[in-house]
């Protein structure tokens, strides 16, 4: 009985957290500003005329890319896309499944997957990686950024218990998923409250 009540309570919290304004507030409280600045510094030299943000939500990471790039925010939650459109009127909001993107092959310079992979099963993540590979041009990059499991960080363990994602991974497991399709050209780990992994993979011209 107590377990069922606990599950219902967590489920109710997840529904509240999915509301765009609550989602943005939680991200800010969880140290998103530091994450944005780190990603901005890491991707500063990447060619980025067309950027596809997989699971882009409300578009909080739009600012790390050039103002004149073509920015596509792809998500499954319409309320978040509407919030994105309000914040980024010149961006393109696409309601779509990331494992079946309605985008042309070779049409993107960069595909980003930020704070998304822990919501995806292993098989689904493989399909998303395959789709990212398809829509990237030769030489294009995928930017993968996500919290990872570190059992030595007690605050991270606590945050995982509250997270909506059902598939947390270690940094090593996440890198293996990236290496399945891409050549890893950048990999680092850092901590805010969670521990994070930030990786860049390149689609080689010969692939």
Give residue ranges: language-model regions.
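C-terminal lobe and adjacent flexible extensions of AdoMet/dcAdoMet transferase-like proteins
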Residues: 200-207
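Class I SAM-dependent methyltransferase Rossmann-like catalytic core
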Residues: 7-34
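Short catalytic micro-motifs in class I SAM-dependent methyltransferases
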Residues: 115-119
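A conserved beta-strand element that flanks and buttresses the S-adenosyl-L-methionine
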Residues: 112
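A short glycine-rich, Lys/Arg-flanked "PGG" loop and its adjoining helix->strand segment in the class I
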Residues: 126-138
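C-terminal alpha-helical "lid/dimerization" subdomain adjacent to the S-adenosyl-L-methionine
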Residues: 143-197
């Amino acid at each position: 009985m107590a377990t069922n009540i606990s599950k219902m309570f967590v489920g109710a919290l997840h529904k509240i957290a999915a509301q765009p304004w609550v989602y943005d507030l939680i991200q800010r409280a969880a140290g998103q500003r530091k994450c944005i600045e780190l990603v901005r510094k890491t991707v500063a030299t990447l060619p980025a005329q067309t950027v596809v943000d997989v699971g882009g939500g409300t578009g909080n990471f739009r600012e790390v890319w050039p103002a004149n790039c073509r920015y596509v925010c792809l998500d499954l939650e319409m309320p978040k896309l509407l919030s994105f459109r309000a914040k980024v009127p010149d961006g393109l909001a696409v309601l779509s499944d990331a494992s079946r993107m309605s985008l042309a092959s070779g049409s993107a310079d960069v595909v980003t997957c930020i704070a998304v992979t822990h919501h995806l099963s292993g098989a689904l993540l493989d399909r998303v990686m395959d789709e990212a590979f398809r829509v990237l041009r030769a030489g294009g990059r995928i930017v993968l950024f996500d919290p990872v499991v570190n059992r030595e960080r007690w605050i991270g363990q606590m945050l995982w218990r509250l997270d909506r994602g059902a598939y947390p991974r270690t940094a090593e497991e996440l890198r293996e998923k990236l290496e399945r399709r891409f050549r890893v050209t950048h990999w680092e780990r850092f901590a805010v409250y969670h521990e994070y992994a930030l990786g860049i993979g390149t689609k080689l011209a010969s692939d």
